[in-house]
Every structure is written in structure tokens, then in C-alpha cells.
Regions:
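Low-complexity, Gly/Ser/Thr/Pro-rich intrinsically disordered linker/tail segments
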Residues: 171, 188-196, 206-207, 213, ...
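Acidic/His-rich structured neighborhood in mature extracellular/periplasmic domains
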Residues: 46-170, 190, 214, 223-226
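Bacterial N-terminal signal peptides
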Residues: 9-18
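Short alpha-helix capping/helix-loop boundary micro-motifs
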Residues: 174-185, 199
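Positively charged n-region of N-terminal signal peptides that target proteins for export
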Residues: 1-7
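Short, charged beta-turn/beta-strand-edge "cap" motif at the junction between a beta-strand
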Residues: 201-204
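Sequence/structural signature of beta-propeller domains
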Residues: 28-39
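Boundary at the C-terminal end of the N-terminal hydrophobic targeting segment
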Residues: 21-23
């Protein structure tokens, strides 16, 4: 009971922040509410790769930055639209909602976003608010196969991933450069928006995911942190985090569609 009261207090605090957050949207508040229930849950990597055969894994007790966002989004969509959370999760995580081996999972966030937009789950609000773009040049997975359990001994999977990278590496995407992110946030960024943090690491587009959360007059990051080993709300502002992460270049901002 005490834990539930603490979560409610934190949610209400986040919703009553500085005016820079602007008017909040119901869908965003639902996302934030669901995300806050994960506070303190342990960060565990590779929870989707416990089996040799690809299958839908639902582990709400151990998350990484991506599965944390996926679970919260799936739970929120199930609440507002009806239906099973697992059905939404499969359509969020896999290309066209079909599980067909390791490479059917949406490993690159560029494709994850594209899939979510096509399914009507999310909208990319970055382009409406930022003219800055980055060209898509994806190659990291195929050039680092030993870093992935299902690639290091599978030339077939590496070839499939290369095909995915080639198809995705056209055009560009809009992002908000880190220099334009203030401690107080921006009026068009709302509580519960999904943050996809972009990177200068060759062959990658995004290196971290989380949620926007206004608190104490600052825009913060609610995320599954590998360094803290759990889901946390950043102590400093989101903008401050960029000063300590030299590989972070900016952010794509997504919003759930109710």
C-alpha cells in the first residue's frame, strides 16, 4: 500500500511541474503512470535471447532500455484500445507482427519507429518541431556479429541483417540536437513521450530509450539504466545527461496514439 501511495505521489508531482511542460495529454499521462510502476525493477540485458528459437518473451520483472519501453507502450495501448497486451507487444517488437526467427525482430530503432508509425501506435513528433536531420547509415550489427549470440555463429542471420541494414540506410530522420535541449525542457515535449537517444557511433542510429518526465522544474529521463542496474528517474536534467555521454548526439521524440 505504501509503495502504491509513493507511486501516486510521484505521478502527481511529475504532472504539476514547471509551465515549460505545457498542457499534458491523457495518453502521455497514462504512459508515464505505467512507466513509473517499473521504478526499481532490475536492469537485465538479453532477456529476449534466453531461447535458441525466437519467441515472444514477456518478462515484466527484468528489463533493459528497449524492453522497458516496449512493455509500457504495449500495456498502455491495451488499456486505451482494448485487447491483449501480448498482441500489441508482438506487433511492436516484430516486423509486421510476425515472429520468423531472430532477424524478424526490430533490432534497429529506425525500423522499430517506422513499424510503430505504420501500425498507428506512435507518431514521430520530432519532424514537426525540429528541422535538423541525420542520414541513416546502419551497419553495426553485421560488422560486429560476435557481439550478438544469434549472429556470431550464423552467417545466414548476418546476411539477413545486412539486407535489413541496406534497406533502412536510405534517406534520413529528424532529431533534436543536444545543444537545443534545455534543462527545463520544451513546450512540445510532454510527460510520457518516448525518447530515442541518437548517437555518433558508426553504424548505429540510436543507443538508448526512455520516457520524458518533468519534475522539480526540469525535464528528466525515466529509463532502465545499465549503470544504476535498475529503472530510475535521472537525478539531473535530461540535458545534463548529454554532458556526461559523449556518444549521445540528440533525441527523437515519439508519442503514443490513443
Amino acid at each position: 500500500m505504501i509503495m502504491k501511495q509513493s507511486i501516486l505521489i510521484l505521478l502527481l508531482t511529475a504532472a504539476s511541474l514547471s509551465l515549460t511542460a505545457g498542457a499534458q495529454e491523457p495518453g502521455c499521462q497514462l504512459i508515464l503512470h505505467n512507466a513509473l510502476t517499473y521504478l526499481g525493477k532490475p536492469y537485465v540485458a538479453h532477456t529476449l535471447e534466453i531461447n535458441d528459437e525466437e519467441q515472444l518473451v514477456v518478462n515484466l520483472e527484468e528489463v533493459d532500455c528497449t524492453t522497458f519501453v516496449e512493455y509500457v507502450l504495449a500495456q498502455s495501448l491495451a488499456t486505451v484500445r482494448g485487447g491483449a497486451m501480448e498482441d500489441y507487444l508482438k506487433r511492436i517488437r516484430y516486423r509486421d507482427g510476425r515472429i520468423d526467427g531472430y532477424t524478424s525482430r526490430l533490432h534497429y530503432i529506425a525500423e522499430w519507429v517506422e513499424n510503430g508509425v505504420q501500425n498507428g501506435f506512435i507518431k514521430d513528433i520530432t519532424a514537426m518541431n525540429s528541422t535538423d536531420t541525420v542520414p541513416l547509415k546502419l551497419s553495426f550489427m553485421s560488422t560486429h556479429p560476435n557481439a550478438y549470440r544469434h549472429l556470431k555463429d550464423s552467417p545466414e542471420n548476418v546476411k539477413k541483417i545486412k539486407d535489413v541494414e541496406r534497406k533502412l540506410s536510405v534517406g534520413s530522420f529528424h532529431y533534436l540536437p543536444k545543444e537545443k535541449i534545455s534543462d527545463e525542457g520544451l513546450p512540445w515535449i510532454k510527460d510520457g513521450d518516448i525518447f530515442c537517444i541518437t548517437t555518433n557511433i558508426a553504424g548505429l542510429d540510436v543507443v538508448h530509450l526512455g520516457f520524458a518526465c518533468y519534475r522539480d522544474g526540469q525535464l528528466k529521463l525515466l529509463h532502465a539504466s545499465s549503470s544504476s542496474k535498475q529503472v530510475v528517474l535521472s537525478e539531473g536534467s535530461f540535458a545534463q545527461m548529454f554532458r556526461h555521454n559523449k556518444n549521445w548526439t540528440g533525441v527523437r521524440v515519439l508519442r503514443m496514439i490513443q
